[in-house]
C-alpha cells in the first residue's frame, strides 16, 4: 500500500512539470502572424517592423498620385508619356478627343502637364495648364474613352499704355518698354502696309501702344490684346485702332485690313457636309462631342485659300487632324484648315487673303475627303457661316460714333502720360 502511494506521487509531479511548459490558448505561436477577426485595422499604414517577423514581407497597396511635369525644349507628348509609363494607346485616345480643340498641339516649353493616376497606376485625368487662368482637362470615362473640358478663370482685364522712342529697331525698342515678342509681331502685322519697319523708322521717332492685359491678382496671365497703335514719325503720324468688329481702322474710321472671306474654297466645292455644332452628341455614348468647324465636300487636290491676310503660325501633321495649318490674322482672329493633302506655305510666312495655301485631302481620321475649316475669335471657335466676321469695308454710323470716342480717349491718355513724363524729368 505504501509503495503504491509513492508511485502515484511521482506521476503527479511529472504531469505538473510538463504542464508548466505547454503553451496556453491565449499565448500566440511565435512562428505565425495574424490579425484577429472583426478588429479594426488601419490599412493605410502597414504594421511596424517590430510587430512583423523578419521572414514576412508586406507590400503596401498602390495609392492614387499626381504627377506634375514641366515641359522642356525638345519634349514630345509621346516621349513624355513613355517616360512616365503611360501607354501610347492612352495618348491616342486623348488625341482623338482633342481633335476638335487641338489644345495639346500648342504646348510650349515651360508649361505644365498634370497627370492623375488611380490606385491601379492607370491615367485617370490629364490636365494641361495653358496659363494660370486656363486649363484643358481630359478625363477617363467608364468605357475607357476620354472626355474634354475647358476651364477658365475670368481674371481682371487692365489697359496699359506702353510708350517709348525708337533706339535701334522697333522690336528692340518695344521690348525695352515691356512689350512681348508676340505683341510686337501683332503690331508689325497690323501696320505692315503703313510702315516699312526696316526703313521708315528713325532714332527719336515715338510710339504709343495701348494693350489690354489679363491679370489674376497681381500676376500677368500672358493673355493680351492690342487696342491702339500710334507712331509719330518724322514724315507724319500713323495710327491704328481696334474696333468692336475685331478689325483695325485708322483714326478716321477707314479700314486698315482687307475684308475676310467666309469660304476657303472655290464655289464648286462649297457643299457643307457637316456644319458647326458645339452641342453635337456622340450617337453611342450620348456625351457632348462638339464639331467646332465647317466641313466642305472637297476632292483630293482641290485648292484651299486663306480667308484673310495673316501669318502662318502652325504647320503640323496630327494623327487625327491630318496635315493642318493655322493662320493668325490679328490679335482677335485665327483660322484653321484640317485634313490637307499638301501644305504650300511655311510656318512664319505672311499670306494674303485669297492666296492658295494648301490642297485639300483625306489625311488623319475621317470618313472621306473633305476640308475642315475653323474660325476662332479670341481663341474660341465660332460658326464661320453665321458669325459677325469683319467682312464690311467701313464702320456703320453707330459704330463710328463709339469708335471715334475711343480714339479721343486714347489721345487724352497719351497726352496725360507725356505730361507726367515731362514732370518727372524736371
UniProtKB/Swiss-Prot annotation:
GO terms for cellular component: periplasmic space; plasma membrane
Gene Ontology molecular function: metal ion binding; metalloendopeptidase activity; peptidoglycan binding
Induction annotation: Induced by TPEN (N,N,N',N'-tetrakis(2-pyridylmethyl)ethylenediamine), a cell-permeable metal chelator with high affinity for zinc (at protein level). No expression under standard laboratory conditions (LB medium), but is expressed in minimal medium. Expression is induced by zinc starvation. Transcription is repressed by Zur in high zinc availability conditions.
UniProt cross-references to InterPro entries, sorted A to Z: Cell_wall_metabolism_enzyme, Csd3_N2, Dup_hybrid_motif, LysM_Opacity-associatedA, Peptidase_M23
Enzyme Commission numbers on file: 3.4.24.-
Pathway as given in its UniProt record: Cell wall degradation; peptidoglycan degradation
Pfam families in alphabetical order: Csd3_N2, LysM_OapA, Peptidase_M23
Cofactor or coenzyme needed: Zn(2+)
Recorded phenotype for the gene knockout or disruption: Grows as wild-type in LB medium. Simultaneous deletion of shyA results in significant growth defect in minimal medium, but no growth or shape defect in LB medium. ShyAB double mutant does not grow in minimal medium treated with TPEN (N,N,N',N'-tetrakis(2-pyridylmethyl)ethylenediamine), a cell-permeable metal chelator with high affinity for zinc, and cells appear aberrantly thick and long. ShyB shyC double deletion mutant has no growth or shape defect in LB medium.
Activity regulation text: Not inhibited by metal chelator EDTA.
Signal peptide start-end: 1-21
Cofactor: binding details: Binds 1 zinc ion per subunit.
Binding site for Zn(2+): 291, 295, 372
Composition bias, Polar residues: 32-48
Subunit and partners: Monomer.
Family: Belongs to the peptidase M23B family.
Job of this protein: Cell wall peptidoglycan (PG) DD-endopeptidase, which may act as a substitute for other zinc-dependent PG endopeptidases (ShyA and ShyC) during zinc starvation. Hydrolyzes peptide cross-links which covalently connect adjacent PG strands probably to allow insertion of new glycans and thus cell wall expansion. Degrades purified whole PG sacculi in vitro. It is unclear how it is able to function in low zinc environments, but that may possibly be due to binding zinc with very high affinity, utilizing an alternative metal cofactor or that it may function independently of a bound metal cofactor.
Protein's name according to its UniProt entry: Peptidoglycan DD-endopeptidase ShyB
Amino acid at each position: 500500500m505504501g509503495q503504491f502511494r509513492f508511485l502515484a506521487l511521482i506521476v503527479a509531479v511529472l504531469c505538473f512539470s510538463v504542464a508548466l511548459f505547454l503553451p496556453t490558448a491565449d499565448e500566440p505561436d511565435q512562428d505565425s502572424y495574424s490579425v484577429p477577426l472583426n478588429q479594426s485595422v488601419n490599412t493605410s499604414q502597414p504594421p511596424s517592423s517590430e510587430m512583423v517577423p523578419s521572414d514576412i514581407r508586406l507590400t503596401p497597396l498602390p495609392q492614387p498620385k499626381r504627377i506634375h511635369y514641366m515641359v522642356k525644349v525638345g519634349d514630345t507628348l509621346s516621349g513624355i508619356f513613355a517616360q512616365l509609363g503611360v501607354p501610347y494607346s492612352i495618348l491616342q485616345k486623348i488625341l482623338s478627343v482633342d481633335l476638335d480643340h487641338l489644345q495639346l498641339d500648342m504646348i510650349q516649353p515651360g508649361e505644365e502637364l498634370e497627370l492623375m493616376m488611380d490606385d491601379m497606376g492607370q491615367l485617370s485625368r490629364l490636365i494641361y495648364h495653358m496659363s494660370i487662368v486656363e486649363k484643358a482637362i481630359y478625363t477617363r470615362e467608364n468605357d475607357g474613352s476620354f472626355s474634354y473640358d475647358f476651364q477658365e478663370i475670368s481674371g481682371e482685364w487692365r489697359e496699359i499704355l506702353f510708350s517709348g522712342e525708337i533706339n535701334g529697331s522697333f522690336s528692340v525698342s518695344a521690348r525695352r518698354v515691356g512689350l512681348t515678342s508676340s505683341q510686337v509681331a501683332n503690331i508689325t502685322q497690323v501696320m505692315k502696309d503703313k510702315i516699312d519697319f526696316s526703313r521708315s523708322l528713325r532714332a527719336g521717332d515715338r510710339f504709343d501702344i495701348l494693350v489690354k492685359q489679363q491679370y489674376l491678382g497681381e500676376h500677368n496671365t500672358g493673355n493680351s490684346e492690342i487696342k491702339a497703335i500710334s507712331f509719330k514719325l518724322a514724315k507724319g503720324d500713323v495710327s491704328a485702332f481696334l474696333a468692336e468688329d475685331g478689325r483695325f481702322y485708322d483714326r478716321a474710321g477707314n479700314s486698315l485690313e482687307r475684308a475676310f472671306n467666309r469660304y476657303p474654297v472655290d464655289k464648286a466645292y462649297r457643299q457643307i457636309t457637316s456644319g458647326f455644332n458645339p452641342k453635337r452628341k456622340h450617337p453611342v455614348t450620348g456625351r457632348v462631342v462638339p464639331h467646332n468647324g465647317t466641313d466642305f465636300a472637297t476632292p483630293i487636290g482641290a485648292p484651299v485659300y486663306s480667308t484673310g491676310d495673316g501669318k502662318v503660325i502652325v504647320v503640323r501633321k496630327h494623327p487625327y487632324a491630318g496635315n493642318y495649318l493655322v493662320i493668325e490674322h490679328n490679335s482677335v482672329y485665327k483660322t484653321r484648315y484640317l485634313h490637307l493633302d499638301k501644305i504650300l506655305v511655311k510656318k512664319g510666312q505672311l499670306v494674303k487673303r485669297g492666296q492658295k495655301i494648301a490642297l485639300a485631302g483625306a489625311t488623319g481620321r475621317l470618313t472621306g475627303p473633305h476640308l475642315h475649316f475653323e474660325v476662332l475669335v479670341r481663341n474660341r471657335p465660332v460658326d464661320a457661316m453665321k458669325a459677325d466676321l469683319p467682312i464690311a469695308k467701313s464702320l456703320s454710323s453707330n459704330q463710328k460714333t463709339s469708335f471715334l470716342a475711343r480714339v479721343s480717349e486714347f489721345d487724352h491718355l497719351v497726352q496725360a502720360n507725356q505730361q507726367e513724363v515731362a514732370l518727372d524729368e524736371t
